[in-house]
């Protein structure tokens, strides 16, 4: 029986949470919070999360599975959170004290819709004693499951914590890049989903690789401008946490945000797309939140791609007309 003394809990059992558990359990014992008892029983029986990442074999001897969130938070000093952004309030609003002096590593890639807060702002508002960091791509859960060479970006300002997390995340297939740009890394992980969605819309409309290359180049330029408007820090987006994550999310067939957009471009309604995918595409809600963030600081005029995405998703604007308008702006 494993000794669960590694002091790490993972919260969330979707594709990304499962991939993170798969990586960590190669190196340490850990605690894994899963919402439903039935899902826990299935994971123990099959050694796989058959609902979200069925090809990923899990070493369940090294994983303590539980539906008890309070226990998961009390058991560990390092809490890795991999849930959809809109679940955060339900999970943590009433558990602020349990997070005191914990290190939170967010793998969340969206904005909390009802408050328009990023995960970083939400957690630090909830409990100021938290040490906060971000784990991001470029990395798809599906390729982790296939043991393909992948790179993760770890952004945190504490050197000792950074070294510990680098050690437990590093495997033969997973390499870690270190950053101290916590805010920028998180914002970029949110923004790239919006840009992947609009790329998907273009693909669904029948645009080819030639156009998509120009569109994604324009997305990269806009991402850099928007990052600076939201967090006034000079940064080069040529690093993998920014440009690399944007590229893989816009181009990959694994990208749920690209798939979401492709359905919209092909003529599906929002509701039909959600029903067909049966997965959370963070770019949908993030488009709404980012549009209003940028509108508040009078920057939306400098973000025509985000504005077009908002018009398509929330103003019932014709996708073909919006992409045609964008094509004239970026040419």
Segments the model singles out, each with a brief description of its role:
Residues 14, 18, 37, 66, ...:
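Electropositive phosphate-/nucleotide-binding environments in soluble metabolic enzymes
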Residues 1-57, 62-67:
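NAD(P)+-binding Rossmann beta1-loop-alpha1 motif at the extreme N-terminus of oxidoreductases
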Residues 199-200, 228-331:
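NAD(P)-dependent Rossmann-like dehydrogenase/reductase catalytic/cofactor-binding core
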Residues 111-209:
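Rossmann-fold dinucleotide-binding core
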Residues 58-60, 66-74, 78-148, 165:
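Rossmann-like NAD(P)(H) cofactor-binding subdomain of soluble oxidoreductases
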